[in-house]
Amino acid sequence: MPVYNVEKYITECMDSIVSQETRWSFLVTVVNDGSPDRSRELLRKYEGLPNVQIIDQENRGHAGARNTALRHIRGEYVMFVDSDDSLRPGAVEALMNTAKEYNCDIVQGGSRMFIGERTLGQTAYPDAEHNSSLLGLPWGKVYRAELFGQVCFPEGYWFEDSVLFLIVFELAERIRTTSAVAYNYRRNVGGVTFSAKGNPKSLDSLYITRRLMQDRRLLGLGETQQLYDKFLYQLFMNMKRILSIPSRNVWVSVFEESQKLREEYFKDFRTAKEEYRPLEETLLGGDFRAFFRAITALWTSVP
């Protein structure tokens, strides 16, 4: 769990974790990422607990904090928790029961989105086997720890969680969802989702896509039809984020780079998904205006 400037939430988050009632033993690895507020002071009351370890480091961002924690894995499975969120009662028990019963590489639980005392929505899943098309959010899941044996979160980028969507989920052979609602997600107006709007750093969404496609090659991972469809979704997400930058020149450059990526990695692939065909056709035809229209149409139909 990365900790940075969360003095308002850290106690609620930690209490929700250490109070989990479960037959499964677990270790809470907290990485104080150079937090300048009172977060570290508030963590002191947990230092004596046998299943809590606190690591202090200079600030390296969310990715750097998670990578530090991953180097200290001792268990068979790992879970990521953001320190302004919290676990639901019974989360560890429900996720781990499913993981062990079905020998899963990843188990995804449901989540509740909230702000203050108000619930904004809830995402629920069936008890079922799943494929690797889960959205690339790190929380609300347990992962087999060995999935991160050769993989880490890219540091220095926004949207570093894309590594899950484009690499980690692809490494998993068995994924299941559970109907248990495991996670409370706080809608944070200070997070990247909101602060990225209009910020040139939004371009990281494109940069990290190229970086991760290169990393896939280094890991010996080939291209597949399923990955191609995910890639098209990723291009949509990239443009959705970057459109907040008020520069047509930037948009056109991103379109051209997207064409190059598709040509480099997926030249001979074609999608069978109706919702992605207009986007694909614009990349093949080099029509930026049609690309813009395709992105706008997807915006209303794809989460």
Regions found by a protein language model. Give the residues of each.
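Structural motif
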Residues: 218-230, 278-286
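Short amphipathic coiled-coil heptad-repeat segments
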Residues: 114, 233-234
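Nucleotide-sugar donor-binding/catalytic module of glycosyltransferases
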Residues: 1-211, 218
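Membrane-interface aromatic/basic loop that binds lipid-linked glycans or pyrophosphate carriers
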Residues: 245-303
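Catalytic core of nucleotide-sugar-dependent glycosyltransferases
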Residues: 182-188, 195-224, 235-241, 245-269
